[in-house]
Amino acid sequence: VDLLHGAFLIHDDVIDRDDIRRGSPTIHADVRDRLALRGGDPAEAAHDGVSMAIIAGDLALVGVQQILLASDLTDHQVRRALGILGNAATVTLGGELRDVINGAIPADADRIRESSWMKTSVYTFEAPWRLWAMIAGRDEEPMVPVGRDLGRAYQAADDLAGAFGATADTGKTAGGDVKRGRSTLVTMRDGAEADVIAEVIA
């Protein structure tokens, strides 16, 4: 799950053009800056940085499968785990696509909430809890609504931190969504969302 999470973050940093993650340079930014110091073409350095980040994210995705196949889980559990994680990856990628589209086309609150669920809830909360329940021989379904709500709350809090937090505190590029014109519950100009933001802050 950590490898899957890492893969998504690496690719997300490329898509969002974020140079900082957890207080350190992102992979594409680190490679770009190291190559630029050698006096090469800045555009080529930037391209190579993106290429390296894509490859690193892809390797992490492959690593998820390799770890499961080498685990002590039964064949049935491995197949089920691959299904859970595969579904999580598919939904998350769909959410990432929607997030990109939301930056080009104004989105309403419902669409933003749906994107947040797809982009964050499934792989961060729902999939891990499904895995734990499956391995323990328990029912997976009761974990889903809780994971969905926690994921949406986490994404809303992350949007707030990204919009108003300082890089030194959040470890991320400050104001990224605002600068890119990305539609989030925070950046929406619809006053009807004020109560939603107030709930998140509380």
Where are these regions (language model features)?
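All-alpha prenyltransferase/terpene-synthase fold signal
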Residues: 1-202
